[in-house]
Amino acid sequence: MFEKFKIRKQIKVIRQRISFLEQKRARSQAALVDAILRKVDPADEDVEYFNRFTGEIDRLRTEMHELENQLLKDKKTGKV
């Protein structure tokens, strides 16, 4: 029972972190779109931030899905 609570709390924290990172990524994404619309090369810094935030978001989503699958598996087997 405690393990299930712990996993749910981890999932909640990861979701909050993803939301925070998506907000930050949106800023760099807006700068990239602006550069494309103005037909200029985007700033290297904006590209770097966008790629860094996207990579971190993808990593966290993978971790969150693994935790959710663990909860489902434990629920099916009657564990936890």
Q: Predicted segment positions?
A:
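Long amphipathic alpha-helical coiled-coil segments
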Residues: 64-80
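Charged, amphipathic alpha-helical oligomerization/scaffolding segments
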Residues: 20, 24-27, 52, 56-59, ...
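Solvent-exposed, non-transmembrane amphipathic alpha-helical segments
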Residues: 38, 52-56, 77
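Short E/K-rich amphipathic alpha-helical oligomerization segments
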Residues: 24-51
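Short, charge/polar-rich alpha-helical segments
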Residues: 1-23, 55
